[in-house]
Swiss-Prot record:
Motif GVYW in this chain: 398-406
SMART domains, A to Z: LRR_BAC, LRR_TYP
Tissues in which the protein is found: Widely expressed.
Organism encoding this protein: Arabidopsis thaliana (Mouse-ear cress)
Lineage of source species: Eukaryota, Viridiplantae, Streptophyta, Embryophyta, Tracheophyta
One GO-annotated biological process of the protein: protein autophosphorylation
Entry keywords, A to Z: Coiled coil, Leucine-rich repeat, Repeat
Family per similarity comment: Belongs to the SHOC2 family.
MF term (GO), any: protein serine/threonine kinase activity
Coiled-coil ranges per UniProt: 106-138
Role this protein plays: Leucine-rich repeat protein that likely mediates protein interactions, possibly in the context of signal transduction.
Name the UniProt record assigns to this protein: Plant intracellular Ras-group-related LRR protein 3
Keyword Cell wall biogenesis/degradation: no
Repeat region (LRR), residues: 160-183, 184-206, 207-230, 232-252, 254-275, 276-299, 301-322, 323-347, 348-370, 372-393
């Protein structure tokens, strides 16, 4: 468990539900205690409200708090403070000597004060979560969150009406009723630009749903049941507060477009690419993603990938398998993206590549193999190869420069191989060459040692 979070049970519980991979769950005893004290804690609306109340700086706060080490013993702190007072009251000590003696005791007091400061931050946050819980429960009891238009649509469907498309965008919705999942004939659902914090699990009942627009809401997580939408082709969750996508999303095998941009994602599900084999467009820009899962290389249908403004450290070695990829934007990953794998040159259909605002110094030697590349942006990189004057010309100029560089490297390698082979051959047959030279000298009338020689007979030129 995170450092000392046992004393902040509510915070511990919410952190685990917001990011299970980074935060361990509270002990069973604490979970039972929380269930008794907060009976609606598992309600989707309530837990989403609590997750939303967690500040984005909590990760840094917990990291610093955890790196402080053990808290000083209270008796040691009290003793240190007494010693500091004694030193200050001792007039016989010079200011320099007093400062030296105070230094050891001041370190103990300072560490205690830092602990107190961070613990107060977490305690205040624990209390704030409690207040948010009370407010969320009160909102639930109000019963006025379900829009009348939503209820009318559901009633129409229950009365036998055929409802294929629902557009409830800009309706200030706070929640969707469970009964929405009963509209089995629904093909398109647009609930963008509302105040939704969660989706009901019953959304899995929309078996024919092909388009789902959840953009510009306040969602902090997606239900696992979303993986049961087997006919879903377009999913838009941009502009929410998602910190992760459920593993079950890989089961949406019909998905063609996924827009998860402008969230708080730090990673993608490990199995992401194994299921989404039909995905053509993936937009994950404006997140905090550091690495792509290796499974993304299995998404052979992918044509468009936008991952700009993240914290991408590099691409998987097998990225070259995305042979249908046409557009890739990796710009503005700043100090995190410093190199590209050689396999990027296997992206045979790549037409546009944006690598601006990174820390790339050298392009892969095989970069010239991107024959279809038309647009290349390398602005704001500390490039050494190719030189900036080539970069300023065109993608074709860069490609041609890298081609010539490659040919020169091949020639150098071939020459090196020939020289190495001759060295090895010379070492293995040196005695034979020496013996042959003596025989040649004798037959030609010369002497071994450099005297003038007559023309050699041609048969002596044959390899022994």
């Amino acid at each position: 468990m995170d450092h000392d979070l046992e004393i902040f049970p509510l915070l511990s519980y919410v952190l685990h539900h917001s990011d299970p991979a980074s935060h361990a769950p509270p002990s069973l005893a604490i979970q039972q205690s929380l269930a008794n004290r907060y009976p609606l804690l598992t309600n989707p609306y309530v837990i989403s409200s609590l997750i939303e109340s967690i500040p984005s700086t909590i990760t840094q706060t917990l990291f610093v708090f955890g790196s402080l080490g053990p808290r000083p013993d209270p008796l040691a702190v009290s003793s240190a403070r007494s010693k500091i007072r004694e030193i200050k009251e001792n007039d016989s000590l010079s200011p320099e000597d007093a400062a030296k003696e105070e230094q050891v005791y001041a370190a103990v007091v300072s560490l205690e004060e830092v602990h107190e400061g961070y613990e107060k931050q977490l305690r205040d946050l624990e209390e704030e979560i409690g207040r948010v819980y009370a407010s969320a429960v009160e909102s639930l009891s109000g019963g006025d969150e379900v829009n009348e238009e939503v209820l009318a649509v559901i009633k129409d469907a229950e009365d036998g009406g055929v409802v294929e498309r629902i557009d409830l965008s800009d309706h200030e919705l706070k929640l969707l009723p469970d009964a929405l999942g009963k509209i089995v004939g629904l093909v398109s659902l647009n609930v963008s630009r509302n105040n939704l914090r969660f989706l009901p699990d019953t959304i899995s009942g929309l078996e024919k749903l092909e388009e789902l627009d959840l953009s510009s809401n306040r969602l902090v997580f997606l239900p696992d049941s979303i993986g049961l939408l087997l006919n879903l082709r377009i999913l838009n969750v941009t502009g929410n507060k998602l910190t992760l996508l459920p593993e079950s999303i890989a089961q949406c095998r019909s998905l063609v477009e996924l827009d998860a941009s402008f969230n708080n994602l730090t990673s993608l599900p490990a199995n992401f690419g194994y299921g989404l084999l039909n995905l053509e467009r993936l937009s994950i820009q404006l997140n905090k993603i550091r690495f792509f899962p290796n499974s993304i290389c299995e998404m052979r249908s992918l044509r468009y990938l936008d991952a700009h403004m993240n914290e991408i450290h590099g691409l998987p070695i097998a990225i070259g398998r995305l042979t249908n990829l046409e557009v890739m934007n990796l710009s503005s990953n700043f100090s995190d993206l410093i190199e590209l794998p050689d396999t990027i040159s296997d992206l045979a259909n790549l037409r546009e590549l944006d690598l601006s605002n990174n820390q790339i110094r050298v392009l892969p030697d095989s970069f010239f193999r991107l024959e279809k590349l038309e647009k290349l942006n390398l602005d704001q990189n500390p490039l050494e190869y190719p030189p900036q004057e080539m970069v300023n010309q065109s993608a074709e100029a860069v490609r041609e420069f890298m081609r010539k560089r490659w040919e020169e490297m091949v020639e150098e390698e071939q020459l090196r191989s020939v020289i190495e082979a001759e060295k090895q051959q010379g070492g293995a047959t040196g005695w034979l060459s020496w013996g042959s030279s003596i025989v040649t000298s004798l037959f030609s009338g010369g002497t071994h040692g450099g005297a003038a020689k007559k023309p050699k007979n041609s048969f002596l030129d044959e390899q022994l």
